[in-house]
Amino acid sequence: MAKYLDPKADLTFKKVFGEHPNLVASLLNSLLPLPAGEEIADIEYMSPERVPRTSIGKNSIVDVFCKTKDGRKFIVEMQMCWTADFKDRALFNSAKVYVDQLEHAEDFSLLRPVYSLNLVDAVFEKDVPEFIHHYKVVHEKYTDRLIEGFHIVFVELPKFKPQSIAERRMAVLWLRFLTEINKTTERVPDEFMESSEISQAVKLVEESAYTREQLMGYDLFWDAVRVAKTLASAPERSYKAGLKEGKLETARKMKGKGFSAADIADLTGLAVDEIEKL
């Protein structure tokens, strides 16, 4: 009997959506507010790391960054814990990608929209029932009039109920895949295997597809997530301090198990020089 890993983990999420263009295209088509006739047919991956040429020197790394042949850009993020500045980060990333287009075209009319899809394993809009939140630049009074450029979507995974969007079959299947498949899965639902995209994704998260070192990193990732979630209700300053300590503790464990500084940095987001001092 096959065993499965949780697709929300950094290792598996990037394997499924960061290495298989057809799967990330299917996910984006199912969850983003794309106009009729403008669904994604072909997609190309771009480097997930972008170093802004701005005075603040802010670096940002996203999970998946890709573009279509017509120039539209797409950012996909899997966020395990909600933080107060995550919306700002999503806006910053989208704005940076939008502005960077001027490197190649000084004609503003050639600027193409940027879409940001943020999957969040936490509830952050506690006073509204909806779990999909679409932000865009609209006229305050005439909301049908908008400035094309940014579309930022947040999905609160814990609020997801299949019946609430039953008419959107692929959206339901992708969200069920993200919320139902994990190490306790004994039987994959038949409807998952009836979809070529979902069945491919299920195969990609089989535990047997990963090395011992990758599985150790997977377990350490969840250790770090547990620390972060424990601290999530703390005041922001305490939360950030605790999150940093959680990353350092994860790095110490990985270092003790023989992981390279580069691999530890990739998993934790810590700088290599910090890791070498541990």
Map each language-model feature to its residues:
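Low-complexity, glycine/alanine/valine/leucine- and proline-rich hydrophobic stretches
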Residues: 141-148, 169-180
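Short, flexible active-site loops
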Residues: 155-159, 186-187
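Accessory alpha/beta interaction modules
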Residues: 1-152, 159-163
